[in-house]
UniProtKB/Swiss-Prot annotation:
InterPro entries: Kintoun, PIH1/Kintoun_subfamily, PIH1_N, PIH1D1/2/3_CS-like
The name this protein goes by in its record: Protein kintoun
Subcellular location field: Cytoplasm; Dynein axonemal particle
Superkingdom to which the source organism belongs: Eukaryota
Disease implication from the record: Ciliary dyskinesia, primary, 10: A disorder characterized by abnormalities of motile cilia. Respiratory infections leading to chronic inflammation and bronchiectasis are recurrent, due to defects in the respiratory cilia; reduced fertility is often observed in male patients due to abnormalities of sperm tails. Half of the patients exhibit randomization of left-right body asymmetry and situs inversus, due to dysfunction of monocilia at the embryonic node. Primary ciliary dyskinesia associated with situs inversus is referred to as Kartagener syndrome.
Chief subcellular location: cytoplasm
Native species: Homo sapiens (Human)
Composition bias, Basic and acidic residues: 428-442, 484-498
Amino acid sequence: MAKAAASSSLEDLDLSGEEVQRLTSAFQDPEFRRMFSQYAEELTDPENRRRYEAEITALERERGVEVRFVHPEPGHVLRTSLDGARRCFVNVCSNALVGAPSSRPGSGGDRGAAPGSHWSLPYSLAPGREYAGRSSSRYMVYDVVFHPDALALARRHEGFRQMLDATALEAVEKQFGVKLDRRNAKTLKAKYKGTPEAAVLRTPLPGVIPARPDGEPKGPLPDFPYPYQYPAAPGPRAPSPPEAALQPAPTEPRYSVVQRHHVDLQDYRCSRDSAPSPVPHELVITIELPLLRSAEQAALEVTRKLLCLDSRKPDYRLRLSLPYPVDDGRGKAQFNKARRQLVVTLPVVLPAARREPAVAVAAAAPEESADRSGTDGQACASAREGEAGPARSRAEDGGHDTCVAGAAGSGVTTLGDPEVAPPPAAAGEERVPKPGEQDLSRHAGSPPGSVEEPSPGGENSPGGGGSPCLSSRSLAWGSSAGRESARGDSSVETREESEGTGGQRSACAMGGPGTKSGEPLCPPLLCNQDKETLTLLIQVPRIQPQSLQGDLNPLWYKLRFSAQDLVYSFFLQFAPENKLSTTEPVISISSNNAVIELAKSPESHGHWREWYYGVNNDSLEERLFVNEENVNEFLEEVLSSPFKQSMSLTPPLIEVLQVTDNKIQINAKLQECSNSDQLQGKEERVNEESHLTEKEYIEHCNTPTTDSDSSIAVKALQIDSFGLVTCFQQESLDVSQMILGKSQQPESKMQSEFIKEKSATCSNEEKDNLNESVITEEKETDGDHLSSLLNKTTVHNIPGFDSIKETNMQDGSVQVIKDHVTNCAFSFQNSLLYDLD
């Protein structure tokens, strides 16, 4: 900065390379340096200065202008700051050539002021001069010249001195267009700052005709160059309106806020979860304090969203609202004495880590889908093998971007997120939507028994989250016919939730590409909360900032925007007791997403239970935040009466492993005491993390049998954490998990492979002990009330392999081992490998 200021005065020289070379070689010559020193001495010689002034006065008199050189006599010096960036000094001087001060009595009644005297203070100004200070710093010096009587009065009366200093500062501001810090102006002990330079007063002589009258044509020779215009005769000055007396207030220093990001190459990988965050890592605040000598004179206080700076001498006051919440415990401040700058570095409190998607796109990464069993890619593959003709025509006409396996074609039924879609109409029969389904028919997924092919651009659709295989979720489907069709003779029922990038519902249910053109789409949204704010993450790339149209109400928030020729809109509503603050939301937009921060009303601070989300207020669905209340409610429903009716159990053992803001881990063990050969324990592990995207399945095997001794009721509760729909998974070590990943295949192929795998480890007697049936119960939602959609599944099963037969290869003896426990450092993709241990 100092180098730039030093070189600014040399930029107007405009020297060529040859001239620079000549000057360099000349100053290396000792004879040239001696002559140059003599020339400088002649310029500073007082006798030569007087001769120069006399010659200039004679030349100006010939032009009809009287010139007087005003030599400033030292008085006192005012120190202040110039434009809040660097130091400045104002020399209050005196000279007899300036007019003497005068006063006249005034009542002050017309201005509302007290009676007193109105003073007239003539002054003379000289252009500012720049000097080099210590540590290569630069400062400006201005000279304001008054009559000696004015300075004499100022030395005797303190009030008159304050008026004189205020007049000098105001004159410099008006004449040179700069901003001086009047509040922190301080009088120094020095009488003059810098080298005195004479100012010039030019007044026209009365009755003198100019050298060439107006209207006379110019001669053949050009006029002699003259740097000043001919002064005009002073006219009567109009009285200026009185200025209102301003109360002295502390000076607000200049500052700059820089957002600092750390470059991480992981954010630039070719992956769906790699994207630079719009939230910076640090905030660097640079505060200009040109009059502050040390950091001891200032008091700095930083809170979560506010920076406060106070100083008495000099008088500074700054209240800066920070754009992001910061960690005040890990911030640092440093004062640069050379530049008189206070640099404050504050680390930003990063939001909860973004959940990494656990769903692979079948079209984009087929090799990943082939390696993992039970993924969306296999569900789509099996669905395409068993698709029907009417379903293909519906997919082509409607353009839905979903892929659902049919129950009739493959023996696998894919349920909607809370409910099953109604069966399709028969061939040649047109389906008429019901009144309750008319508005949301275009958002529903494929019914059981039909398959819809994804559109070619379904992988990169903004609404679908980049997943071509999506489950449908709607509040309109609720017919009993759909439930009856889902309870056929299928051996396996699979419940899928494809969450895409953000764990949201399908593209059709969220208003994806399957919607009609011209209608707004519902964007994928993540929601996180703390006690005072709500943070919304809109996962739509390339949002146009000028298209944002928001409407904020204490009970709801509505936003409409556009991106890539698509229009998006969503409606966010909360419970009546949960209210938002009406302050303006903080919006940050990047190339990949947008972050919106909403403040909670002071009377509603704390953790909220649920929130309602949809494209408008007519199609809202309830979502739950992860908190202790919601988890306790889920455990009460899991441990309700169906367990007691089906099995004779001891009191359940519940162990809370970990409870944090981002993770809740509970271990509940249900034991049976009646039969030791049957199921000894059932462990449920609830692992709900707000920063991971999980896709969970409940898959069971069904083999014909007549014996059923026990039943276990399992409920899947959907709880939203940071806007994600996640299911509590019922993990059991029974035989139902032996066919994990094969439920998407056709029924005939699945049964043959299952029998082949089972014959390697099971006897014929153990095969007859396998029995499992799935009964799906659904809750209907009231049209006037928004409630959570809970999918309840009752599983009747018989304990599988609770003993191991070990054959000695030497003597052929067989040893039966019961209650075998094996600890493994990793989890198997297929539970059959665990049973073969």
